[in-house]
Structures are given as structure tokens and as C-alpha cells.
Amino acid sequence: MVDIAEAMPTTASSLPSDEALRKFKCPECTKAFKFKHHLKEHIRIHSGEKPFECQQCHKRFSHSGSYSSHMSSKKCVQQASPSMVTPFNPYQLMMYRNIMLQLQTPQVSFLPSTAANNMDYMSLLQANLFQSLENGTSPTPTQEPSAPASPEPKIEVVDEPEVSSEVKTEVKTEVKTEDSVPEESITPAVSMSLSPAPEQNGNESMNNGGSGSDGKSSPDWRPLRSRSFLNDSQVAVLQNHFKRNPFPSKYELSAVAEQIGVNKRVVQVWFQNTRAKERRSNRLPSMPRGSVASAAAAAATSPTVWQTPVQLMAAWASQFSNGNNSLTASQDERNNENTDEVMDHDGLKDGKETPLDLTLSTDDTEPEWSPEKLIGFLDQTGGVIQELLRQAGNGFVTNQEDEEEKPIKAEESPVSSGSSSIWPSFIGQYPSILDSASLSVLEKALDQQKSSEDDASSLCSNESKLLKFPTTPLKEEEGLFSCDQCDKVFGKQSSLARHKYEHSGQRPYKCDICEKAFKHKHHLTEHKRLHSGEKPFQCDKCLKRFSHSGSYSQHMNHRYSYCKPYREQPASPSDVLNGGSVTVSPSSSNTPPPST
């Protein structure tokens, strides 16, 4: 029982009000807070200070609670991941599919292989691919169109980030018709333009600035810089190095420049221009529609039906055996008639000296679709496909650099160096690609891709699951400390140290009365109050006392507004007989009386 004089204050004004508890007042406005750190975060609203920043989306926050909520929800992952995904190119997908099917088929050892063979085979393959694209179905026998559409001028822009200026060229085109296969003379250009149409004979020049005038008639032509001139021996050395490694390091560039006695920048620009030329020559869309129709019309005369890749190779073999001599003669004739004038970065040329010739001759160089270029094509266009296969769990995609460090012996290679197969011995560097299970996964992955946008979105959802926030501790000067075992971030080092007990399972603070142990010291302090009966926290309205600060805070924040104050009650007859004292009880029977 509680005496009235001890339980009730002398006057009602002595009870601390809510305004008295909010002793931390904002100097800018009339708001007041119970805790100092609430005032600090409120002042940031006036000052505009936002000390917390997300490392993923770089969004800043003024309140630690908003920052913690943002980091826990990981909303910024979905916004950052689409930029990491390269969309599919339908032409590249079809090329990749056909290459994989060719690798899956048995090797035909009786088929000859020369520099011109790959060119002829790729022209047939391109014609078949374009025909399937127009029909919207799988590769089928090609038919001669009634009226081939005239190709439109098209400018292909090669984006080379390291090239400081633009390289331009003039391309001469001429159409020649042979008995077996009509071929078109198009010299792959290290330039910013292409010839508009195969029907236009003569010199057609389109530079990057949109001018179509001939360079010889312009009064602004000046001689090339002396550093841009390379003799035949220097170009031969550069071509040999390019065959071995089209992407040399800066140390290899310096070594090559020292070997041929030129500046490193000259070698670097030569490699960049040559790579651009290779990309342009290997790009399917760069083939004019007119040449596609011509190739398709010529292929229609062949009795072979192009239903499968094996039949396509048979058609190529038949064509080569019938027209090898005429094709070789026509290629030599076109090489003599074509003229490539490669200009310096300033767009200058000199009639007295021979400018830098970046064209690859067919005598001492490999064909356009050589094994090295095919490997580069697979590496450049198959990155997204490799990611799909890697996520599928097969793990059969190999690294080209790792394979190059382990040369394959001649007896271990599936195709010997002296074999006449159309697929050379470089296939041995990718033995696991020939796995039927892997190819089935590749086919399934390719069939699921309907458009480049769908590819990007599907890969985005898969890669977002793999992304994780940095688990390394942040710098102390940033004021944030992250746990190295989870995604939580703390503003103090001591808070991080206490949090690590959650992962380690240690309970260093033990009670000396019972056997309980706690991870944090303040938990032990509050636990000891259960043994001692101490309740230092009391509600000033209902006079209820609490031993734990958390219970007291919850009561003050949620129940203080409607908890019933204590009032006098008439004493029961037994109380009057015993002592005659008047008791105080809460107005609500649900609220327990205050404990002392």
C-alpha cells in the first residue's frame, strides 16, 4: 500500500510536462527534441548537410535512418545494373549459332582450304543468313528475287576511343560477274565511310564531314607528316605482330616501335586502324543488299539445298572445285584495279610519296576469316553468351589467354596442322565447346532471346542477384564503418565492435548471480536490476516504474498520451479497521499500481 503523502506530488504543477522533457530546442525553428542526436539530425534539414552517401547510386542522406533503410532495401542495384549488360546483336547471334553448329559437325578432311575458300564460304553463309532474316525463319534454300532492291548509301562509323583524329579513305568499287559466283570488289576500309552502292562506278568519296568532293581538287590538301610514312618492310613487321596479337600492350608497342625504328604513337595508330578495318570486314550488316541478292541468286543455281550447315559446306566445296581458277584470277585482277588511299589524321596526302597503306595483300597475309580473326570475333561477340552459359552452371567457357599459355601438341590436337579441313587446328584450343550438352544449353539460351531489349532485361535480373555491396570497412574519415560479414553500416567504431558479437556468438558479460551471459554490457546492467529490484525509470503521469530503459521509452512514446493518472479511492472497511489509511490506485483496473 502506498501512502498519499508519499505517492502523490504536492501540486499538479510539479509534474514535468512533455515540453519540459524536450529540452533540446532548435535555434532555427520552434521544434524541440528529447534527445540530442535527434536535434543534430534535424539541424541538417536547415543546413542542407547530407553526410551519408550510397556507394552504389551516390545518393546522399541527412538522416542515418534513411541511409540505413536505403542500404538495406538495395533499391539502387536495379538502376545500376542495366548499364553493365551489352545487348545482343541478332546478326552476331546467328553467326555464333552457325559457328557452333559447324564445330559440332564431323570434320571433312577431303575439303581443300585456301585463302579464297573462306571468303567464298563466308559469302554463301552471309547470303543464307540474310535470306533467313528476311523470311523470319531458319536457314532455308535461297531463291532468286524477282527485282532486287537497289541498295541505299550507308555510312558505318567505327568508334575507336584511343584514336585522336579521324582516318579517311577513298574506296573504288567495281562489280565483276564470273561464270560460277558473281563477286563484288569492295576493299575493306580503315575509314569513316563506305561506298554507297555497287552499281556506282568510279570514285565515290564520302568523308566524315559530309563533303563529297574529290581530295585532289581541294586547295586545302597539304603533305603528310613524315612520321606517317612506313616502308614495305616496316608494314610487314607490323602485320606479323598483328597476326600474333591484335591487342598489344604498351610495352609491346614500344618494343615493336623500337624494332622498326619509328615512334610509338605511329605503331599505336597503325594497330588501331587495322583493328577497325578488321571489325568492318567481319561485320555482317556492312554487306550491301545488292551483293546479298547476287550471291543468293547464284547459289540458287546450285543443286545443293542449304538446310543444314553440313549441306552448306558441301555447296561451298562443290563451288570451289568448279570455279577455283576463275575465282583466283578474278581476285588478282581486282587487287590490281582497286586503289586505297589512306590519309593521315589531318586528312592530308602527298602525291610525291606513298602514304601509309593499311590494306592487307592476299599474297603474304591470311584471309579475312582466318582462325585468329574468328577467335577475336567469338571473344568480342560472345561475351553475353558466355555469361549466360556461365550462369547456367556448366562452366565450360574457357579463357583464351589461359589456353594460349598451354600450347596444344600436334598429336593431341583434333586437327593436325597439315590437315586440309576447312576448320584449322585452333579448334583444339576450345575442346569443351564441342560438348553436346554445352551446345544444347547454348541453343536453349539463344532461342530464348527475342530481341536485344529482352536480352538486356533478362541479363540484368540475373546479374543483379550476383551484385553485392562492398563488405570492406569504409574509411574512418567518411564517418561510416561497414561490417565485413554483412551489409550493415554503422556510424561509430564501437557500434561496429558490438555488432560483431552477433556473428561471433561471444557473450563476454556474465551475471555474477545467475548463469546468464550477454553480448553487451548494458544488457547485463539492466538484467542485474531484476535481481536487485531497482526500477529507476518512472512515468510522471501514471507513476508506473520500469527497470529497463526500453520498456520506459516504449511506454512514454506510445502509452503516455492515454495512460490513466492515479487518483484517490475510498478505503475498504478492512483497511479502515487495520490502519485507517487511504490508498491510491489507478483509475483503470488494467494498469498495475506503481511498485516501490
Curated annotation (Swiss-Prot):
It comes from the Eukaryota. One of its GO terms (biological process) is central nervous system development. CDD domains: homeodomain. Expressed in the six touch receptor neurons (TRNs) but not in the FLP and PVD neurons. Expressed in the M4 cholinergic motor neuron. Residues 133-225, 324-369, 395-421, 569-596 are annotated as: Disordered. Signal peptide: none annotated. GO terms for cellular component: nucleus. This is Zinc finger E-box-binding homeobox protein zag-1. The lineage of its organism: Eukaryota, Metazoa, Ecdysozoa, Nematoda, Chromadorea.
